[in-house]
């Protein structure tokens, strides 16, 4: 395990003779409301970045990369961006695209990404409605009784904890998220000091570490203040 001196990022390298090389950038993203801001961020950072200003780099990688795994995942307390490939050049390119996406996404210059992936108004035949990729996804999720039960149990069991919130977003709360709060969440939580990076497999250490350092060295270490505190006992 390593710590990047300049940025405070932590890295775990599992040195194994496995040709399937893997990389993951993970961030501790503790929800503070039901707006699903981290779910929307997970979608949005993969909609173009500083070095890769295309509309959907994720889709381009799906079409042209030799990847064996490519995804982004939102959990109740973290967001992960894993990639894998057996081809060394392809693996480094996947790392580069994902690092650029999480640290330098186009969301700060293009509010339309937030509107597309989060929520926006639409007018059809004189009827004003709300739409958005994540909003519509969570409307579908909330149509499942099991999902509603799990959310209710989390609120009851963790009333003083981030786990009481719906990390994916409550369709009733998502439209209250502003663009300003959205970009502020990225600046606060997507900092190397709040990240945990993972490398696994038969990688070229010098090339991989140099690529990581090129991105991480652009940040100064901070205290991210994202500790998870234990839930005090709850009286039934």
Q: Model-flagged regions — what are they?
A:
Residues 1-18:
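N- or domain-start disorder-to-order transition segments that initiate the globular core
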Residues 19-23:
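Short, conserved catalytic-motif segment at the N-terminal edge
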Residues 26-36:
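Short pre-active-site segment immediately N-terminal to the catalytic Zn-binding motif
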Residues 30, 44, 48-53, 57-235:
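Charge-rich, well-structured scaffold segments of protease-associated domains
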Residues 35-47:
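Active-site recognition of the HExxH zinc-binding catalytic motif
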């Amino acid at each position: 395990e390593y710590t990047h001196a300049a940025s405070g990022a932590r890295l775990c390298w599992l040195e194994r003779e496995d040709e399937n090389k893997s990389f993951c950038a993970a961030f501790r993203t503790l929800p503070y409301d039901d707006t699903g801001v981290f779910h929307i961020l997970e979608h949005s950072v993969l909609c173009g970045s500083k070095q890769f200003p295309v509309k959907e780099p994720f889709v381009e990688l799906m079409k042209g990369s030799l990847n064996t795994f490519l995804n982004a995942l939102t959990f109740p307390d973290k967001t992960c961006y894993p990639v894998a490939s057996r081809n060394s050049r392809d693996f480094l390119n996947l790392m580069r695209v994902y690092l650029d996406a999480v640290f330098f996404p186009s969301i700060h210059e293009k509010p339309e990404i937030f509107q597309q992936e989060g929520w926006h108004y639409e007018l059809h035949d004189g009827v004003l409605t709300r739409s958005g990729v994540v909003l519509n996804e969570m409307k579908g999720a909330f149509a499942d009784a099991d999902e509603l039960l799990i959310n209710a149990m989390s609120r009851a069991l963790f009333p003083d904890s981030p786990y009481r919130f719906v990390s994916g977003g409550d369709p009733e709360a998502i439209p209250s998220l502003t663009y300003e709060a959205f970009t502020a969440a990225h600046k606060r939580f997507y900092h190397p000091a709040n990240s945990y990076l993972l490398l696994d497999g038969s990688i070229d250490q010098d090339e991989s570490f140099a690529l990581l350092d090129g991105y991480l060295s652009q940040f100064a270490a901070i205290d991210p203040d994202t500790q998870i505190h234990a839930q005090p006992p709850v009286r039934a």
